[in-house]
Amino acid sequence: MKNDSARPQPGPQDLNEQSQSLPRRKFISMVGASAAAFTILPRHVLGRGYIAPSDQVNLAYIGLGTQGIRELLPLIQNTGFRVIAVCDPNQHAVGYRDWDKLSLKMNIRQTIKNMDWESGGDNLIPGGRDNGKSIVDQFYANVHPELNYKGCNAYEDFRVLFDKEKDIDAVKIMTPDHLHGLISMAAIRRSKHVIVHKPLSNRLIEGKKVIQAARDNQKVITHLVPWDSNGSMETVMAWIGSGAIGTLKEIHNWTQRPVWPQYSSLPTDNPAIPDGLNWDLWIGPETMRNYNSNYTNMVFRGWYDFGGGSMADMGHYSLWTVFKALQLTSPHTIIPNLSHVCAMNEPLPYRIQNNFSFPMASHVCFKYPANGNRPAVDLWWYDGGMRPAIPEELLSDNKQLAEEGMLFVGDQGKILAGFNVQDPKIISGTKMDSPVQMASVKRSQVEQTSTALPLFIDAIKNSKQYPGNIIEAEFLTEAVNLYAASLRSGKLLKYDAGNRRITNVDDANRWLDREYRSGWDIASI
């Protein structure tokens, strides 16, 4: 943790003789704290109501788009953190997209207690490192004036941040998907704790390397957002274990995503790079190309190079507890079905060959082998409006499936639930009357994220990993990247998990790894 004039420091009136006579760095060395740990100095030593710097995790926040800022707000309100640096290759609030035009700005104003705050830029939707710095600075000035906060530093390059901010304890990573793995690896190698938004990586091999780095450095506490879910997987497993639907055979999970464009052609125009955007840093490890707003902000998710598609976006919310409860590891077969787009080359139509963006709609089947606790099972993922066939139990009652949901199919019955396994109910089976439907806790995605923050802090204090670490997400990370590889190839894939290779379509193996741009490889980042 830093102790310089640029950071909030205790005033002399808050320190007694004992704490003044013992510099914090000397205190840390005396108790043998590691680079990945921090020391707690009881608040009563410093006075009533004082938040000791040693009580807080010094955090650098990397990625200040709309979702990044949305999740920054609950984090700065958690007194266990002190944000000391922000980073984004985009400086100004220009060209950002969001679910609506005003709600994020209003949330910012309420959080920082300044109802006149404006984002600058094009003055529509907040984003960029200038806004991030402004939010952090004004929050501490207006809400915690007792800290005498002097301001956080702002960087456009995360590598420079790591070089200069030697005393940060942790980072939170909210960049586009293609940078998640690289920045996580950079942090772990520097013994910085990591909170990273899903997916861990949009490449299978890269994700495996980051997970191995986390295994090799257990003192670094890691957390993948989202951890847990809104659902009731424990209830579902109790029903399955009791034989309520017989032997589980299939799981079906469907979403209304994407809610962003999935372009069927590459941009051909060449607009100017917006002032304040470092396009080279935004591209990062990927192949350089001309700037286009169709690549950036919300719509990056639809491109194989920059995003992970609908499953990477939403499957972590719905499937985390499913993977854990059913002990799903690596699938041996992946079967894609996907939409295509046609165009006219007058006077003839043709089908667009596309291996650069996710399809408008798809459903993908993952075949998982049996383990000691269950037989083999198939997992089906659907997006773009695709859904499984309406079960006879609903069809006979003139009902249909909701636009999002989850269905567990056994050889003697079915369990229907919401997308995140919430509000499950048995719709047919051998024990229709005995199970009791359980109410689910409903939390927004931002609420899910914020509920994990105290657990992350406790894990750092206790130097012990907790549920939600990136190692636990290994097989879900693998699945979302096999989803992308199967859609990109358009072919049934046979996967050899031990060797991390596709055995029947050799060309598809290139989609499992990244061809890193010079200076951006994961080995040297």
Protein language model regions, located:
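N-terminal glycine-/serine-/threonine-rich beta1-alpha1-beta2 phosphate-ribose binding loop
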Residues: 2-190, 208-221
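Non-transmembrane alpha-helical segments in soluble domains
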Residues: 28, 133, 159-162, 184-188, ...
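C-terminal helix-rich "cap/oligomerization" subdomain common to oxidoreductases
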Residues: 29-53, 357, 372, 458-525
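Structural recognition of the beta-strand scaffold that forms the well-ordered cores
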Residues: 58-62, 83-88, 172-173, 195-196, ...
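Glycine-rich, aromatic-lined ligand/substrate-binding cores of catalytic
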Residues: 64, 270, 275-464, 479-484, ...
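Short, solvent-exposed loop/turn and secondary-structure capping segments
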Residues: 70-75, 95-100, 182-186, 206-207, ...
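Short, solvent-exposed turn/loop segments enriched in Gly/Ser/Thr/Pro and often Arg
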Residues: 93, 154-155, 174-180, 200-202, ...
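A contiguous active-site-proximal alpha/beta segment in oxidoreductase catalytic domains
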Residues: 193, 200-276
